[in-house]
Curated annotation (Swiss-Prot):
This is Proline--tRNA ligase. Belongs to the class-II aminoacyl-tRNA synthetase family. ProS type 1 subfamily. GO terms for biological process: prolyl-tRNA aminoacylation. Its EC number is 6.1.1.15. The gene is proS. It comes from Nitrosomonas europaea (strain ATCC 19718 / CIP 103999 / KCTC 2705 / NBRC 14298). It is an enzyme of class 6 (ligase).
Length: 568
């Protein structure tokens, strides 16, 4: 491809609203153009990258035995009403009416549609298992679209759905999809981790996320360097350190702590470690009032709390309810002498001589101990976020925390949708059974941004070779002034094309600095510079995008050498 025949629309500066480096670089490199809030046009350069990612995904999905189809983007409301999600999915679902006043939505996901296909077409166990997938544009009405294509309203997704006669078959395909996803992300050239995750709004019984590791990631991931353990911080088990609770070292005393409400403020005021303080959070569930206890330096994990059956619908208590129950405003709550049911985190049981609220405004209690000053908590659960240094749940070391960008998610849905929509089959004995189901998603357009978050420098993008828009750029210095430069550049260009190399010849009448800057910005991994001086010695200059210095190649061997480099 010649630049003169291509649409290269680079910018020197990114628009002010671009926050993430990937958003800034995608706009500057001309990969995307903004149409409206959360809406982007994929320009020719960006589309080449998308197509390469889609090609890798299709190859690996097809190799796994999955079958590609394409479902409508617009769904009738009746399907979503069958599962109950029409009313509960939330404002992210964009709902519309046709001219006949019939309700539809732009599909944010396709469980209902694929189950409708399965219940119509699959009748016998002989047709199972089967795995369908599509690559399609989806729409979610994000309340605050941001970060470019990372959180856009319209995005491209690969979603797959499998149907099974039993759980064993589902688990086999689930493992196969995990392996397939690992191959996809490895081929793309991403550094990633597969982590155990919460099923969220999709539901089901098992779930794993695939995260591209990046400091800008929205999600926190807990992992153990000494093993394969990894989990989203929402799900990672906080294992107690196993330290026996010490005997009391002091007498409980009430201390004035004026205007000190947070554990950190109290710790600073009293000159004690914050981990020696205890926080009490007031919540309600099922109309009942509870106190949740955590160590002062730990954070509540709401996902874990909601998994406790009697706290599934918990809410933080209103101040009026707190005062009615505790005769004390928030900020000074504690577990001593209260009637409320006490739910404690595991780490609380290891505490002794701790400081907590005195249930009196402006006061805290110090040197508080279980068994002496108050009974043990009514119930104990894991209700906190893990912190770096916690024991790994697999017993093989300690946990570290990194940031990640979610690019894939797999679920064991079981019968969550198939039962509600009556997707059944006849088993070997002629009995009617409900199909087991799995679903598997990849954020195709999000991968482009995630890859950039991992691969960039001060000059621009450094795409992995497998998804770079072009493998090689040829920059002829003096193309419009020197016949020799033009001739040799054209020869090398044609030789590279014949060798199957995706090459971009910069035949613009531009300064070399502009051409170099554009090539580095858009992330082409290899570059050949042709100039009169080097041609006199039969040489051209080669430099990889990550190389600090260029090297000279023989003009006669340049095409074959580049072909080998690009093939590695």
């Amino acid at each position: 491809m010649r630049v003169s025949q291509f649409f290269l629309a680079t910018l020197k500066e990114a628009p002010a609203e671009a926050e993430l480096i990937s958003h800034r670089l995608m706009l500057r490199a001309g990969l995307i153009k903004r149409l409206g809030s959360g809406l982007y046009t994929w320009m020719p350069l960006g589309l080449r990258i998308l197509h390469k990612i889609e090609h890798i995904i299709r190859e690996e999905m097809n190799n796994s035995g999955a079958l590609e189809l394409l479902m409508p983007a617009v769904h009738p409301a009746e399907l979503w009403q069958e599962t109950g999600r029409w009313d509960v999915f939330g404002p992210q679902m964009l709902k519309i009416q046709d001219r006949h006043k019939h309700d539809f939505c732009f599909g944010p996901t396709h469980e209902e549609v694929i189950v409708d296909i399965a219940r119509r077409e699959i009748k016998s166990y002989r047709q199972l298992p089967i795995n369908f997938y599509q690559i399609q544009t989806k729409f979610r009405d994000e309340i605050r679209p941001r970060f470019g294509v990372m959180r856009a309203r319209e995005f491209i997704m690969k979603d797959a759905y499998s149907f099974h006669a039993d759980v064993d078959s589902l688990e086999q395909t689930y493992r196969l999809m995990q392996e397939t996803y690992s191959r996809i992300f490895t081929r793309i050239g991403l550094k990633f981790r597969a982590v155990a995750a919460d099923t969220g709004a999709i539901g089901g019984s098992g779930s794993h996320e695939f995260h591209v590791l990046a400091d800008s990631g929205e999600d926190a991931i807990a992992f153990c360097p000494a093993s394969d353990y990894a989990a989203n911080i929402e799900l990672a088990e906080a294992v107690p350190h196993g330290i026996p609770r010490k005997e009391p070292a002091g007498i409980m005393a009430k201390i004035a702590t004026p205007d000190r409400k947070s554990c950190q403020d109290v710790a600073d005021f009293l000159g004690i470690p914050v981990e020696q303080t205890l926080k009490a959070l007031a919540v309600t569930a099922g109309g009942k009032f509870y106190l949740l206890l955590l160590r002062g330096d730990h954070q509540l994990n709401e996902t874990k709390v909601r998994k406790i059956p009697f706290l599934g619908d918990f809410e933080f208590a209103e101040e009026s309810r707190i005062i009615a129950e505790m005769s004390c405003p928030p900020g000074y709550l504690g577990p001593v002498g209260v009637k409320a049911e006490i739910i404690a985190d595991r780490a609380v049981l290891e505490m002794s001589d701790f400081t907590c609220g005195a249930n009196e405004e402006g006061f805290h209690l110090s040197h508080v101990n279980f068994g002496r000053d108050l009974p043990l908590p009514d119930q104990v659960f894991d209700i906190r976020n893990i912190v770096a240094g916690d024991p790994s749940p697999d017993g093989k070391g300690v946990l570290e925390i990194c940031r990640g960008i979610e690019v894939g998610h797999v679920f064991q849905l079981r019968t969550k949708y198939s039962e509600k929509m009556k997707a059944t089959y006849l088993d070997e004995s002629g009995q009617t059974r409900i199909m087991e189901m799995g679903c598997y998603g990849i954020g195709v357009s999000r991968i482009v941004a995630a890859a950039i978050e991992q691969n960039y420098d001060e000059r621009g993008i450094i795409f992995p070779q497998t998804i770079a828009p072009f493998q090689l750029s040829i920059i002829p210095v003096g193309y419009h002034k020197s016949q020799q430069v033009r001739t040799e550049a054209e020869k090398l260009y044609q030789a590279c094309r014949s060798a199957g190399i995706e090459v971009l010849l910069d035949d613009r009448e531009e300064r070399p600095g502009v051409m170099f800057a554009d090539q580095e910005l858009i992330g082409i991994p290899h570059r050949i510079v042709i100039g009169e001086r080097n041609l006199r010695e039969g040489m051209v200059e080669y430099q990889g995008r990550l190389d600090k210095t260029p090297q000279m190649l023989s003009l006669s061997e340049a095409a074959s050498i580049i072909s080998k480099i690009c093939g590695d």
